[in-house]
Amino acid sequence: MSSLDVEEVIETIEMIRMRNLDVRAVTLGINLLDRAHPDPEELARDVREKIVEVAGDLVEVVEEVEDELGVPIVNKRIAVTPCSIVAASAVRKEGREAVLTLAEALDEAAEEVGVDYLGGYTALVYDGFTEADEAVLDTIPEAIEGTERLCASVVVADERYGINMDAVYRTAEAVKETAERTDGHGCARLVALTNAPENTPFMAGAFHGVGQPEACVNVGISGPGVVRAVVEELKDVDFRTLHDEIKRTAFKITRVGELVGRRVAERLGVEFGAVDLSLAPTPEEGDSVAEILEGIGLESCGCPGSTAALHLLMDAVKKGGAAATSRHGGYSEAFIPVSEDAGMARAAEEALTLEKLEAMTAVCSVGIDMVVVPGDTPVETIAGIIADEAAIGVVTGKPTAVRIIPAPGKEPGDEFEMGGLLGRAPVMDVSDYRPTMFRRDGRIPPKFPR
């Protein structure tokens, strides 16, 4: 072994032990199209059987790889073909009850194989609704209330088709009802998406796209603590040097993620899909994207200059990660969820406003994520927030999303506790002015091509 090899091994060990490096998620995508059936009970039974058959060894294999490599793997997850596609014929026969039966079966399968979450209770409605899309969208609050692991997503916009404003408003209604049914907590498992990637390992927006293989493993990396340590050691360098060092660090982090993903896929006998290069924070101190930005030179995340600092970070991470693997996918950006990032939650009590957060999402993916707002926030306001993020996605071509939590009984400045990796966050203030335009029907067209 060369001295360089030894040095790299030591650096990796230090990243894991001292700087919270982990693999955030290993997600097994499973195609369910071959289990479509017009009878809801048979559909549910066949889907559950296939998930247990394909994913039965997932948790055991992931834990074996974790022990062998010494790399912590935080979450094991499953993503399936969107339910609005799989259940289309059953919905035609039995209506909305067909997708609720399927939701229950998916949650039971997730519990049986031992994964943390299962994504794919999804409606792809960026250019209109099918009968099954409407069934999924209308039942999201009930499905989330009745399950523990099921995640729901609605793809409301796409850069090629524009924004389906009817879908935006109905998704906002689903968010509001879900909050009322679950005391806000269920909204962590519901997201509105634009330009949704079909191979992301991250919830709540993960689903297994129809262009994906029969089954594949996608991996989500972490590493904010590692990047933060690098930034803190380079306080006096110029921006180009800082960019280069972040890029080199992202390269190493991505290598770890790909190694884990390939080994898990090989042992499960499925294809290796992609590494999502996103920096995913946690509520743990020191594992924060906001603290990276502050290390670059912000007094508090959200102050002027925050968007530029985030752009520098994202460009370096993407370039370093792309050099490390040819199989990058998903969002591959920095995540800035408020409740899941202790630094972002702290910033929301200081310089960070909802409007500044929206501006920052223009240079990174995911968007308005895990933001807690007052429980009496009107549906029109939630729809406006979703539409604004969708517009950013349509114009830039980037994946964007909204995962917003109206906390019943809470007012601006109150604290809302989610628990675990979902963390806690202050309730952020929203404008008192309502966007009454969202009572209109129809679509906002895509941008004119350059």
UniProtKB/Swiss-Prot annotation:
This is UPF0210 protein MK1214. Signal peptide: none annotated. Belongs to the UPF0210 family. PANTHER family: UPF0210 PROTEIN MJ1665, UPF0210 PROTEIN SPR0218. CDD domains: RNR_PFL_like_DUF711 (cd08025). InterPro entries: UPF0210 (IPR007841). It comes from the Archaea. Pfam families: DUF711 (PF05167).
